[in-house]
């Protein structure tokens, strides 16, 4: 696939309008997606490639499904694994592709699964249900885990819970995949921390808030017992004042990390920011 780009689009299948994952060839010069095929997955709500790019993982009703990415970009199903919880909403993997982390929005659960040498999904290593109440009874008053990923040094697993306005910090044991709570970052009430990411140099930590509609930037340092974070900036996720229907969704870097992109539901916009990698 040298010099060739593919796009894999996950979709809810319960409506009957989609089968799960749609595979497209990408014509970069023309700026077009060219339909190739569909792969059946029950409600593929989130996709994540392995660190080596050889495997594609999908959320599914049964838990997680693993696909091998073939040389031509097509997908071949490897296996699936149950997570003993409701369907997840976000996936991330360890740098060496030994573990995959599943965020459970509906049941407030973080699940850790082993990954096998061939990339297939293994057994459950650990799972924790969050407890507590949030501040918005009409919407998010109970735990809703929305994003989880390892810190740059992979000593900790950080887990965003937009229902209780917290980012929990778990110590991660690479030997057996077990997690243990060591700290909690308490966010502003009714802010709903939905998504976060780290700069590749490990110096900065970015948090996107769904209801507050802002991005907060933190400095990040490796602490002996817990990570050390300090807020340095807050900026709106939209170019104008958000309306009541606006909800910040996701956030990503450009490949060179000189820009940050943020998508917003409700007003259906994408915001782009210049990024200073020194500050």
Predicted regions located by residue number:
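Short coil/turn segments that connect the beta-strands within blades of beta-propeller domains
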Residues: 4-5, 52-54, 96-98, 153-155, ...
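Conserved beta-strand positions in repeat-built beta-propeller and related beta-rich domains
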Residues: 9-15, 58-61, 102-105, 159-162, ...
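Short loop/turn segments immediately following beta-strands, especially the blade-tip
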Residues: 24-30, 67-74, 113-122, 171-178, ...
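Surface loop/turn motifs at the tips and blade-to-blade linkers of beta-strand repeat domains
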Residues: 37-42, 80-84, 129, 138-140, ...
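Structural signature of WD-repeat beta-propeller blades
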Residues: 45, 89, 146, 194, ...
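Asp-box/WD-like beta-propeller blade repeats and closely related beta-sheet repeat scaffolds
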Residues: 76-147
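Loop/turn-rich, solvent-exposed surfaces of beta-rich toroidal or solenoidal domains
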Residues: 246-279
């Amino acid at each position: 696939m040298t010099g060739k780009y593919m796009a894999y689009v996950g979709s809810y299948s319960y409506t009957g309008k989609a089968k799960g994952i749609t595979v497209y060839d990408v014509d970069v010069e023309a700026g077009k997606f060219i339909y190739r095929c569909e792969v059946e997955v029950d409600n593929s709500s989130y996709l994540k490639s392995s660190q080596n790019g050889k495997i594609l993982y999908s959320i599914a009703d049964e838990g997680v499904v693993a696909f091998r990415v073939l040389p031509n970009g097509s997908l071949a199903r490897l296996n699936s694994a149950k997570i003993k919880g409701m369907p997840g909403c976000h996936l991330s993997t360890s740098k060496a592709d030994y573990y995959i982390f599943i965020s459970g929005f509906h049941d407030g659960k973080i699940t850790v699964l082993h990954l096998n040498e061939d990339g297939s999904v293994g057994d459950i290593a650990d799972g924790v249900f969050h407890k507590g109440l949030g501040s918005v009874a009409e919407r998010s008053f109970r735990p809703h885990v929305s994003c989880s990923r390892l810190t740059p040094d992979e000593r900790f697993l950080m887990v965003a819970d937009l229902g209780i306005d917290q980012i929990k910090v778990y110590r991660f044991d690479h030997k057996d995949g077990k997690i243990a709570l060591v700290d909690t970052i308490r966010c502003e009430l009714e802010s709903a921390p939905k998504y976060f990411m780290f700069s590749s140099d490990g110096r900065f930590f970015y948090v996107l808030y769904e209801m507050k509609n802002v991005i907060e930037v933190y400095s990040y340092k490796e602490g002996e017992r817990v990570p050390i974070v300090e807020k340095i900036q807050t900026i709106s996720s939209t170019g104008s004042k958000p309306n009541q229907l606006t909800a910040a969704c996701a956030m990503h870097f450009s490949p060179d990390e000189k820009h940050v992109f943020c998508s917003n539901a409700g007003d259906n916009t994408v915001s782009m920011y210049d990024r200073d990698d020194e500050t």
